[in-house]
């Protein structure tokens, strides 16, 4: 039986691309991981890999084809050169031509959306900072971030946004959509591709009393600006004896994303959280994103604001409040439970909630904590939950060594040891650079199944 090879999504915002050229022809035998074609978008040319071995039995889209929609079948992969009969799933998809077809990347994003919306009644959709009776409306995380910046720019004319493609292109992930039209080019500033340059300008502007919001196309590129972030922004208040503040926000997507390789999938939360003088925020949902970004812009300290591109398009309930600002340094219990505490942040919260729902069917009642702030860490909420459940499992979309998970384990041991009935277990990504090949990438990233396994161990169910 043949399977369809579909036009991949190279980013969560990609809708179509150009199939630049085929690197294989009909009848070629291929192995998993072999490069089949080159796909071009308005930003880059990427390679399309085979996810399985077989024979290219038919090429459906010729090379050079433009505006190929994501999810379009571009070739058949079969067991031999004459195999063009689709398997059941592919045949059904083909028969239902009007139904949208998900690419591998969009399938993962859809899984994240499902994970982030568990059906258990114990999930707390609100936050303790929201008054009872508040009306809610639905908004994507991307829109919540945009509204937070727009509201603060209306409130304070010292606030401005600067970064690559934030103005005319409206952000690499469309987070700054509409800001240029409302506030103009003096306050929404496109920059050259020089993170070191525009971050330094931002730090200087902050020291002179402005409130810059610096967008990195990805936090991986913040490595080019790390001297300004750590040696200038983070240390100025201390080294000036409290005379000079640096109210600046460095924000952008952080952590793993589908098929972007080892250099674009790193989690910098633990890196920046290790630095005295920095505030580090990592929102999970639109409530976190809006309330914390507004707080970050108002903060007199430098803030590193870590977003997740897989959650940008996810829709959440957001409170209808004139000025919704969350406190920095305060975690929230997003699901109540009594048997085990699962602590996470950013996209890890979605996996934790999915795991908690599955564990409930086994009779394990898990409490889930959304950290929201990585520095300063809310030790009080963690330790209070530990005192109730006597077990902690941490979940982190990042490496295990010198991680936020490691810090939580240390806190539990140093300040909550008498309440521990089991060792603290960490569920993280593999301790290796993230592979580009889809099958290897999947094995190396944190997932709900690994969380379930860890919880069973600390509850002595296995």
Curated annotation (Swiss-Prot):
It catalyses: N(6)-[(R)-lipoyl]-L-lysyl-[protein] + pyruvate + H(+) = N(6)-[(R)-S(8)-acetyldihydrolipoyl]-L-lysyl-[protein] + CO2. CDD domains: lipoyl_domain, TPP_PYR_E1-PDHc-beta_like. The keyword Oxidoreductase applies. Thiamine diphosphate binds at residue 195. Transmembrane segments: none annotated. GO terms for biological process: pyruvate decarboxylation to acetyl-CoA. Gene3D superfamilies: 2.40.50.100, 3.40.50.920, 3.40.50.970. Pfam families: Biotin_lipoyl (PF00364), Transket_pyr (PF02779), Transketolase_C (PF02780). One of its GO terms (molecular function) is pyruvate dehydrogenase (acetyl-transferring) activity. Residues 2-78 form the Lipoyl-binding domain. Binds 1 lipoyl cofactor covalently. Binds 1 thiamine pyrophosphate per subunit. The modification N6-lipoyllysine is found at residue 43. Its EC number is 1.2.4.1. Heterodimer of an alpha and a beta chain. The pyruvate dehydrogenase complex catalyzes the overall conversion of pyruvate to acetyl-CoA and CO(2). It contains multiple copies of three enzymatic components: pyruvate dehydrogenase (E1), dihydrolipoamide acetyltransferase (E2) and lipoamide dehydrogenase (E3). This is Pyruvate dehydrogenase E1 component subunit beta.
């Amino acid at each position: 039986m043949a399977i369809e090879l579909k036009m991949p999504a190279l980013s969560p915002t990609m809708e179509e691309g150009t199939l630049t050229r085929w690197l294989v022809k009909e009848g070629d035998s291929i192995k998993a991981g072999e490069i089949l074609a080159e796909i071009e978008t308005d930003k880059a040319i990427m390679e399309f890999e085979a996810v399985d071995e077989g024979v290219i039995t038919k090429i459906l889209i010729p090379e050079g084809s433009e505006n190929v929609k994501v999810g379009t079948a571009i070739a058949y992969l079969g067991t031999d050169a004459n195999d063009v009969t689709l398997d059941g799933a592919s045949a059904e998809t083909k028969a239902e031509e009007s139904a949208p077809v998900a690419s591998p990347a969009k399938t993962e994003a859809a899984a994240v959306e499902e994970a982030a919306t568990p059906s258990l009644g114990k999930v707390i959709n609100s936050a303790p900072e929201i008054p009872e009776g508040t009306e809610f409306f639905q908004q994507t995380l991307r829109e919540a971030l945009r509204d937070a910046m727009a509201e603060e720019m209306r409130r304070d004319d010292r606030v401005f946004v600067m970064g690559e493609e934030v103005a005319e292109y409206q952000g690499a992930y469309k987070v700054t959509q509409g800001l240029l039209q409302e506030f103009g080019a003096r306050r929404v500033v496109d920059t050259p591709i020089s993170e070191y340059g525009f971050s330094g300008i931002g730090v200087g502007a902050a020291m002179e009393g402005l409130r810059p919001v610096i967008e990195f196309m990805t936090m991986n590129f913040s490595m080019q600006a790390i001297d300004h972030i750590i040696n200038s922004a983070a240390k100025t208040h201390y080294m000036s004896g409290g005379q000079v503040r640096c109210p600046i926000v460095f924000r952008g997507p952080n952590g793993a994303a589908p098929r972007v390789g080892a250099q674009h999938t790193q989690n910098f939360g633990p890196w920046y959280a290790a630095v005295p003088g920095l505030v580090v925020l990592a929102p999970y949902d639109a409530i976190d994103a809006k309330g914390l970004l507004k707080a970050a812009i108002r903060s007199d300290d430098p803030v590193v604001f870590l977003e997740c591109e897989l959650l940008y398009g996810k829709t959440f309930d957001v409170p209808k409040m004139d000025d919704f600002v969350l406190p920095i340094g305060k975690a929230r219990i997003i699901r109540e439970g009594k048997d085990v505490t699962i602590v996470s942040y950013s996209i890890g919260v979605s996996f934790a909630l999915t795991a908690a729902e599955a564990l409930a069917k086994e009779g394990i009642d898990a409490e889930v904590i959304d950290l929201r702030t990585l520095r300063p860490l809310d030790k009080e909420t963690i330790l209070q939950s530990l005192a109730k459940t006597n077990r902690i499992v941490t979940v982190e979309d990042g490496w295990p060594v010198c991680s936020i998970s490691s810090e939580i384990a240390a806190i539990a041991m140093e300040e909550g040891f008498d309440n521990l009935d089991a060792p603290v277990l960490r569920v993280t990504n593999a301790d290796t650079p993230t592979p580009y090949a889809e099958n290897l990438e999947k094995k190396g990233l944190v997932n709900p199944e690994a969380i379930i396994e860890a919880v069973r161990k600390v509850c002595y169910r296995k």
